């Protein structure tokens, strides 16, 4: 059985010509046998190994990070060190995954969430299920810190997942009086409406940190901020990838674009941004009592 298919807790059926999403709790035990990976050692990213990890990610991914930008993203002050995992085969790095702690708003309720990124596996170790193994390990660590949800985005829809929400993502400034935080449970029925947007909630300190002009190209339109990460592609072409949006007012609608969109470095005006593809956002929930049951997928 496909890994993600076993994590799905959605059913989809067609009524008249419309597809209706019905979410129901249907936990399935992991189909990944963790004992298969006992030869590997789990480590964590720090100032002592960050240079070697950056070299590994650059070698085995499509993008090229300088060490300062990579450290700024990974060793941020908001995430727990246990969310940044390195997998070793003896002393050799074979895989990495990074989880950035964020807050999201869905249906006027705030939840802590792990935003997964830098999932990288050495080419010689692929097709062994290692990426699923370290995803499980990351979410176990998150669960132990009281975080129930994870999220990731991809340019390609995962065919084996029965149902998925495609959501535009934005940033809004935190307002504790307007929204309530709930980190104990997550009502899966909130995802039944596909047109519900996802909002990242940032406080002043987080906005100051993530909208950093040293590492990002910032565009401001109608008091709305768009933050593009300065980065290089393997063909040496400079790119800016949209990683954050701070939507301050509703006049931005015609300019709204999904996170992870690519802007080529020669463009300076927002309407000239070229979208690479639609972004599929996947939210998954740790809905179990026994950690061995792993992740249940929405």
UniProtKB/Swiss-Prot annotation:
InterPro entries: Acyl_CoA_acyltransferase, NMT_N
Molecular-function GO terms, alphabetical: glycylpeptide N-tetradecanoyltransferase activity
Keywords assigned: Acyltransferase, Transferase
TM stretches of this protein: none
EC number of the protein: 2.3.1.97
CDD domains to which the protein is assigned, alphabetical: NAT_SF (cd04301)
Keyword Acyltransferase: yes
Biological role stated in the UniProt entry: Adds a myristoyl group to the N-terminal glycine residue of certain proteins.
Name the UniProt record assigns to this protein: Putative glycylpeptide N-tetradecanoyltransferase
Organism: Melanoplus sanguinipes entomopoxvirus
């Amino acid at each position: 059985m496909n890994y993600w298919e076993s994590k799905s807790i959605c059913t989809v059926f067609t009524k008249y010509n419309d597809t209706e999403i019905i979410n129901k709790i249907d936990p399935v035990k992991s189909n990944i046998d963790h004992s298969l990976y006992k030869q590997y050692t789990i480590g964590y990213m720090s100032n002592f190994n960050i240079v070697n990890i950056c070299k590994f990610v650059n070698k085995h991914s499509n993008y090229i990070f300088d060490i300062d930008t990579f450290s700024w993203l990974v060793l941020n002050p908001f995430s727990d060190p246990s969310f940044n995992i390195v997998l070793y085969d003896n002393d050799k790095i074979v895989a990495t995954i990074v989880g950035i702690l964020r807050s999201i708003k869905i249906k006027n309720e705030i939840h802590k969430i792990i935003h997964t990124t830098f999932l990288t596996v050495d080419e010689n170790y692929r097709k062994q299920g290692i990426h699923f193994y370290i995803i499980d390990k990351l979410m176990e660590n998150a669960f132990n810190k009281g975080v129930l949800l994870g999220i990731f985005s991809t340019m390609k829809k995962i065919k084996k997942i029965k149902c998925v929400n495609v959501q535009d993502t934005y940033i809004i400034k935190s307002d504790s009086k307007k929204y309530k935080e709930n980190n104990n449970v997550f009502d899966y029925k909130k995802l039944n409406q596909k047109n519900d947007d996802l909002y990242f909630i940032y406080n002043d300190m987080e906005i100051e940190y993530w909208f950093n002009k040293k590492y990002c190209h910032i565009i401001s339109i109608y008091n709305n901020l768009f933050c593009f990460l300065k980065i290089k592609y393997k063909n040496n072409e400079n790119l800016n990838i949209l990683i954050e949006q701070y939507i301050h007012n509703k006049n931005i609608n015609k300019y709204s674009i999904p996170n992870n969109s690519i802007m080529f470095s020669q463009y300076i005006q927002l309407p000239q941004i070229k979208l690479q593809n639609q972004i599929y956002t996947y939210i998954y929930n740790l809905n179990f009592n026994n950690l061995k049951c792993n992740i249940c997928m929405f």
